[in-house]
Amino acid sequence: MAAEIGNAKLAVMAARKVDDKRLHVLAVETEPTPKNCVRNGVVCKPTEVVAALNGLLKKLANRLGASVVITKIYVGLNAHTLRTTPVSVSRSVFDGERLTDDMLADLEQEARRQLPAEKQVLEVSAVTYMSNDNVVAQPHDVTGGSLQVTYAVANVDADVVDKLKQCVAQLPACALADYLIAPKTTAELLTTPDDRQGCAVVDFGAGCTSVTVFVDGALKHFAVIPLGGQHITADLITFGNLSEYEAESLKRQFGIKYADENTAKKYFQMADASDGTKRTLSIDDFKKVCVARLTEIVKYVMEQIAVCVPSDQLSAGLILTGGLTTMDNCAKIVAGIAGVSARIGSHAHWLTPDSVKQASHNEYAQLVGVLMQGNGGCVETQSKKKKRSGFKEIIGKMGEKMEDMFSEYK
């Protein structure tokens, strides 16, 4: 079982692993996130979020059958303060000295300690090993001089994790199995070993966009940008004088399509105002709004990529996923803005043919990625036989109490 707690939507998914290589997705339930309850991936109003999640889990359990009880759930962590921080540590190596695993573990702990106290370290990955200014493949091969290790330290504000734990703890009879780094699990889901020689996975969410960079087969960097599809919708509401429903509908139907194409059509005809006034929206203005915000998002994505690698070293380019990718010509527009090749990623090959169809949609890549990484079981099965024996046991105990009550009159 996995849950996504996003700015715009809450979603839960149930799946069974097949040979540890694919997922049989059994059911998906989703609904809009209660308004202003999650901001930039951080739970702000846990009571409302818990109530909505509990309702979704009940629906999910009903789909799985009366005998199935959901006891645990995995959650993807995707807050805007989630990122990797590069940290370098070094130590001297005496001539003839062999580095042990314990010595390397000490270096990793030193890297962890370099982050501020308000940050929670989620994971530490060695990116490069250098000895006497030369890159080495294996640190154990260093037998003298010095060793410098650069780590990618995955971290997030500690209160983000605390709020997530508090939220899940309020779910009745359902514990947190684990929280996983969503940008990383999604990126690993959508890439091949060849892709990871040089690529960036960009996940366009509603409130946040994540970017995960792989170079030379290893994860080099990831970050979450607090901008996403909701911001395009908000711009259309403001500049087009539209309702939220109108703005979201136009964005999904025409946003990227009209941003890229010349069309003889000059205006969108909107529903009349309450006083009968005719309402229209210039397609030129519509295009400018969509492209301006998307350009801003892609610009920040490219800045994060530049932190660790020149964009011309991304041999596999940008791999896109998330809600915005459902719009026509998304990859073409993004490639034009970024100056790097781009394509829409797919996780359908990880799913069995009998999985529910919606699970293959890009907006569910995060949930599928989290489930692929989860290892423990999340349900218990109650047999009818056990339920009957439990009922008989209760009746038996009631009988004993009744016997005790009347024993004094014997």
Feature map (PLM): residue ranges:
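Short, solvent-exposed amphipathic alpha-helical segments in soluble enzyme
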Residues: 18, 195, 333-339
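Long, low-complexity N-terminal extensions
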Residues: 184-190, 296, 340-341, 345-347, ...
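Short, charged, surface-exposed secondary-structure boundary motifs
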Residues: 40, 189, 234-235, 351-356
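Nucleotide/phosphate-binding catalytic cleft detector across ATP-hydrolyzing
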Residues: 1-9, 13-200, 219-220, 229, ...
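Glycine-rich phosphate-binding/hydrolytic loop that grips phosphoryl groups
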Residues: 346-396
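Glycine-rich phosphate-binding loop of actin/hexokinase-like ATP-binding domains
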Residues: 197-239
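Extended, folded domain segments that form the structural surfaces/walls around functional sites
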Residues: 4, 191, 203, 296, ...
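Glycine-rich phosphate-binding loops at beta-strand->alpha-helix junctions
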Residues: 255-258, 313-337
